[in-house]
């Protein structure tokens, strides 16, 4: 046990040498679903001097479980652990609500972080380890004022959003939030009042954004009418048949970039029949069929570019991705159910794909749509890695052909749709106050 404690403390002491780049003007950045950061500025905090004893007491009482919580919540940006959770939840949600839940987690954490940064620099409350040299610091030093706690802001948002859309998890996420807040106090980076204020701020912004988007998901029920005829999808119980009726966030409508009708797939069916599967092609097909590539890649790049040490800019990246995913989902399913494009194993019932065919029309490909979005949006956020994102888009789209569940035209149309959606999102935030034509501050570039 003693060796374990020594190792944990050494890891924490190494980590705190990392200096985060702050964004002192982030409180002025434009927000998504609230008017501005300034309009929601918190009231001034009371004196922190009486709270120093509480921080010291927490540190003196740290046990193994407390150390583990500090390490767990030190990882990534304030929203990192919550985005990891929602990534798994929304992609397995069978309603139209999953994509909205994912989007709101991104926009609400970002908007609440903007409010937090406005409040921080309005009052300039010092961090506990700055206010009193007896306080040790066991977390990366975020060079920004203490009030309110940015991790607690994200926790307030996440517990509210996840609890609302996935009510069975409400108790669990609230307990997680409590442990998070306790860990920030014990780590010496927040006073108890910082965590309480941050949590309540996050909760308030989340509730407001849930209310603002309450009519985004369509209430219209599917009429259960399946089209008939050659070249038309002919499965049973299609998933998300009304998703294209939902409101979009950036696009003027779900059909704004709807591709033209699909061609006759006779030649493309021949291409699939004649395709010679290799170890590499099957590996690519299985990889993209089983991984949430977009989410994993975004987490990775945020770490590589040290944006996890820059809470406002990390929150912005997560929000841009969440909004883009949401509009891509709506636009893609608008097109799917506008055309009811047939799948290869329906066009030729003797054809057997490598992976199971999803239960909805094929044109355009959802994977390809998300791949096109990744290529454009991530290249904006992390421009030096543009070639990586181009390859991911190409491989991701091609994987659906290699898997035998999409015609090539499905993928080409999807890539183009995703690129257009991402471009529209980027255009919207070009003047948000954070953009500097590259999406990154020079200090945060990967070395």
Task: Name each model-derived stretch.
Residues 21-447:
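Acidic/polar surface patches and capping/hinge elements
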Residues 1-21:
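Bacterial Sec-dependent N-terminal signal peptides
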């Amino acid at each position: 046990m003693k060796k374990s404690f020594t190792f944990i403390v050494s890891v924490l002491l190494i980590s705190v040498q990392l200096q985060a780049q702050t964004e002192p003007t982030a409180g002025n950045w434009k927000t998504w679903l609230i008017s501005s950061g300034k309009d929601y500025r918190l009231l001034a905090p009371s004196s922190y001097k009486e709270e120093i004893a509480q921080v010291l007491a927490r540190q003196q009482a740290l046990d193994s479980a407390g150390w583990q919580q500090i390490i767990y919540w030190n990882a990534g940006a304030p929203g990192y652990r919550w985005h990891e959770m929602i990534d798994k939840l929304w992609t397995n949600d069978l309603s139209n609500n999953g994509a909205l839940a994912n989007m709101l987690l991104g926009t609400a954490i970002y908007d609440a972080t903007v409010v937090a940064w406005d409040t921080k620099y309005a009052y300039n409350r010092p961090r506990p380890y700055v206010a009193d040299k007896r306080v040790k610091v066991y977390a990366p030093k975020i060079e920004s004022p203490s009030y309110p706690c940015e991790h607690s802001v994200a926790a307030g948002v996440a517990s509210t959003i996840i609890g609302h859309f996935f009510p069975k998890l409400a108790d669990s996420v609230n307990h997680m939030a409590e442990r998070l807040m306790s860990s920030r106090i014990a780590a010496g980076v927040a006073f108890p009042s910082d965590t309480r204020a941050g949590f309540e701020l996050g909760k308030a912004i989340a509730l407001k954004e849930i209310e603002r988007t309450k009519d985004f998901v369509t209430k219209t029920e599917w009429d259960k009418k399946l089209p008939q005829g050659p070249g038309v999808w002919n499965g049973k119980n299609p998933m998300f048949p009304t998703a294209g009726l939902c409101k979009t966030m950036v696009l003027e409508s779900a059909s704004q970039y709807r591709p033209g009708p699909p061609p006759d797939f006779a030649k493309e069916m021949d291409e699939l029949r004649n395709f010679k599967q290799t170890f590499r092609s099957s590996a690519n097909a299985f990889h993209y069929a089983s991984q949430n590539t977009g989410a994993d890649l975004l987490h990775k790049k945020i770490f590589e570019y040290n944006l996890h040490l820059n809470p406002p800019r990390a929150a912005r990246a997560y929000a841009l991705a969440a909004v883009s995913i949401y509009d891509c989902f709506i636009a893609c399913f608008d097109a799917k159910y506008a055309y009811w494009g047939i799948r290869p194993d329906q066009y030729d019932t003797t054809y057997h794909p490598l992976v199971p065919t999803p239960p909805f029309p094929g044109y355009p490909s959802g994977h390809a749509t998300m791949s096109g979005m990744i290529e454009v949006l991530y290249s904006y956020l992390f421009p030096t890695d543009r070639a990586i994102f181009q390859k991911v888009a190409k491989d991701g789209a091609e994987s659906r052909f290699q898997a035998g569940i999409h015609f090539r035209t499905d993928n080409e149309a999807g890539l183009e749709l995703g690129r257009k959606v991402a471009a529209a999102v980027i255009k919207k935030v070009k003047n948000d106050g954070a953009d500097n034509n590259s999406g990154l501050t020079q200090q945060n570039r990967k070395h």
